């Protein structure tokens, strides 16, 4: 049991430590203020999304406030998880003169019982409670049955403070990537984190709801740089991040040090990629982009890409990853070189949405590489892709 936590990063470390050293059930509870957030700014939604992804057995709230003030917190948590919830509230607040708490056992039990409808399974008391409170709760719930939650939970990713629900198109900012960017490459080599942060802030100000983070460069230690950049961006931006790398050691470092539930970009249909990357996605509770390519490269046909996408989804589900956390990228090829490929990409995207029921992702800007009027080409293709069901365009 990890309780009275205010920092999601610290709680993530505790959960990973437990999972890596034992196989016991894990219960986690955080402490929230009257503003609905922890002392470090964590929302109930971010806590629920992150901890559910990490695979805890129950989560909830302890200490904090009296049970009469906890309904907004418990309700918000319940929206983002079907796990059993835990409530161990204070007996209200202490009187500054007598130091006695202001909620008596009868009222405490009444308030707690009003929260059972949100999927609360574990009930207790924290500051100001005593055996009389627990006895009263027990008598009130003796004839009640636990009401497990079976609702559909939206696909979500989060930072420690902001949840993004993937229930419509969500823009992923593409500029934190050295490909074709001389100044960005120079910033990586010179360890110029300020330049990278400027790019991140610019993307958020331009409307990005998620940021792709790629720091791959042959002249640097990509693993160390990924951790450094993730921490730096999370210190100034509250949007969720997408960790972009092909190297397993970089992927794991990024997933381990990220605060919240990220997207991993990416896994593909190659056996080595499936066997290496998917277990990491499961362990760290992330979502993952699945690229529709394999050992034979990128199929020229929509059918070929769809079959790889289907294989990725099946393998993900085999290791315990819900298909709602798999975002298929049917791959955008440069239209100047592969003019027929655009149609195949859109057809594959449509099939993934309608037949697999998965969210979709595309690097939109690839379509116009080497062409004039890139913005016009990009937005035209983006419109066509969204018409076919694109959820996550990666764009500037």
Where would I find each of the regions flagged by the language model?
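Domain-level signal for soluble alpha/beta catalytic cores
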Residues: 1-329, 333-396
